[in-house]
């Protein structure tokens, strides 16, 4: 059996698609990579509906798309929302699509029953900061039923009050919000281990400390309330040149895994499927943007 990797691409025109050098992508034996959808400009995050529609967010384009497909390629792409403020985050729960802008979260109830026309959105929460610097949000529902929403630091490096530089969680009806993890500069990828149900997340390190420091991180948060160092300490052992005198690195939780500096570790997901070979199951897949 051939294992397929689908590439949802933000392409503006067919000529760009025709020239996409997929043959240059290095794959393990038995894997194949193909273009799944080409008309989803500025695609960022994805969420799969219960009836098979694929919902795709954007960052700068301000749109949210719904894609009808046959499991191999897109058949129809519908713009279900436009003019939003960096709607980077999408997540599904109970047949409803949740969309996160910079400072607020919307809910589209029973959306797949309404397509190709989207239902009117319901405002869930609008008390997140309005800063656009690291303000786009990747969102997911946790095993506890809460919606997890990161709030990035509004800077390269600075010390700000909650909820900046944190991962928060929000009740689906918006009735409560709380901080789960602190000292997180800018995470845009997290998941829960399929066996332990514990949270793991990537974090992007600060700039202007050099080409080789600090490392990007994969962090493990088995319980709420942990602090991962920002802005005082990076990578578990590198004191910040501006804020490091205030706190010691030993006070914070070090990363479970260090990556290269400035590789921009973004999406992160544990593989729980059955199509890939056994050695892939339960492993973390991490996408790096690169500097």
Which residue ranges define each predicted feature?
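A short beta-strand motif characteristic of beta-propeller blades
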Residues: 33-37, 76-81, 122-128, 175-181, ...
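Residue-level detector of Asp-centered blade-edge/turn motifs that repeat once per structural unit
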Residues: 48-52, 92-95, 141-144, 193-196, ...
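Beta-rich catalytic cores
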Residues: 39-42, 50, 60, 76, ...
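Asp-box/WD-like beta-propeller blade repeats and closely related beta-sheet repeat scaffolds
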Residues: 77, 86, 91, 103-142, ...
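Conserved beta-strand positions in repeat-built beta-propeller and related beta-rich domains
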Residues: 39, 48-49, 55-63, 99-104, ...
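Short loop/turn segments immediately following beta-strands, especially the blade-tip
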Residues: 67-72, 108-116, 222-228
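A short loop-to-beta-strand structural motif that recurs across blades of beta-propeller domains
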Residues: 23, 63-66, 96, 104-106, ...
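Beta-propeller domain segments
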Residues: 19-29, 136, 153-157, 165, ...
